Amino acid sequence: MAVMQLENGRTYRDIGAIASQLAVLNVQIDRLPMRENPAVRELLAQDILNVTEKQQILAAFQSEFEQFKRADGCQWCDLKVLHAGSQQIYALMTQSNRTHTHTDAEVLHILAGECVFGFVYPNGSQVQLMLQAEEYIKVPANTEHWFYLTPSLYLKAVQYYTTAQGWVPQYTNRKLKIKN
């Protein structure tokens, strides 16, 4: 269940209320429930996945990819698999937990685990949004934000891309006012 925390400490737990709060940024958030698929659920429960297992999971979400392709111009997707033992986890945490923008939209479908996005409103105030399994977010291009994992250090999510260059962070170096 998504949880949004404002700078003043107020929290929202209703996805509709959260979507309303993020509308000023054109950030889209919604539930995207998974179809019942025991084989995929079993794979999602594993920490480490080989290439074939990752492809099986992506194949199970092909219809979602086709939907994002039509709606958002996504060209390809990959599976982000992060856990405490991941080689790339600390590099990712260092790279993404600072305020930045991207030249493309950032589209992420959480399959397992949880993560936090933070956003900077036009007036400079900041909010944080924790996302969990079966939630989807689309952060428009050039939206100032940051991203980090919760203390569980566990996330499996499908990332959708429109270009290869679009996800390169452009750091804004804004000081974070809110971060748990």
Feature map (PLM): residue ranges:
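N-terminal leader/capping segments at the start of a protein or of a new domain
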Residues: 1-71
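Structural signal for conserved beta-strand scaffold positions within catalytic alpha/beta enzyme cores
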Residues: 5, 31, 78-81, 159
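Conserved short histidine dyad/triad with adjacent acidic residue
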Residues: 76-103
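Double-stranded beta-helix
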Residues: 150-180
